[in-house]
């Protein structure tokens, strides 16, 4: 797990090509690291995604290859360096913000 997180921290972006997931911890780790994530377009990823996620058809390898190429090209541009660098402090702040929003939504429904 430590090695996996170190690799993710130093990656320009993460690819999660699953056909089936319960609740993807790779995506949650990537969100904390504030990384761009390419996700297979499956229900759990639709639910978990944030602004830094890009969905692709998990049954279309050509689309995945094109999405990876486009993302790698964008990540190599100096004007997008910060977007792909990842910032754990910002990622944690985003998670806290999302948790507060979720908590408020629950309060509106149940209180």
Question: Where do the language-model regions lie?
Answer:
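Short alpha-helical segment that forms part of, or immediately flanks, the ligand-binding pocket
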Residues: 5, 27-32, 43-47
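Aromatic "clamp/platform" in nucleotide-sugar-dependent glycosyltransferases that forms part
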Residues: 19
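Short hydrophobic beta-strand element within catalytic cores of glycosyltransferases
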Residues: 13, 32, 36-39
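C-terminal alpha-helical cap of glycosyltransferases
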Residues: 69, 92-111
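Conserved acidic donor-binding segment of nucleotide-sugar-dependent glycosyltransferases
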Residues: 54-61, 71-75
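Conserved donor-nucleotide binding/catalytic region of nucleotide-linked donor-dependent transferases
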Residues: 70-90
């Amino acid at each position: 797990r430590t090695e996996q997180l170190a690799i993710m921290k130093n990656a320009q972006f993460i690819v999660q090509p699953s056909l089936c997931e319960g609740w993807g911890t790779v995506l949650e780790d990537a969100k904390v690291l504030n990384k761009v994530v390419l996700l297979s377009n499956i229900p759990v990823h639709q639910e978990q995604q944030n602004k830094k996620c890009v969905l692709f058809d998990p049954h279309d390898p050509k689309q995945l290859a094109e999405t990876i190429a486009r993302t790698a090209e964008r990540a190599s541009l100096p004007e997008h360096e910060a977007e792909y660098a990842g910032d754990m402090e910002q990622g944690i702040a985003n998670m806290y913000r999302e948790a507060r929003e979720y908590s408020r939504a629950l309060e509106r429904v149940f209180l």
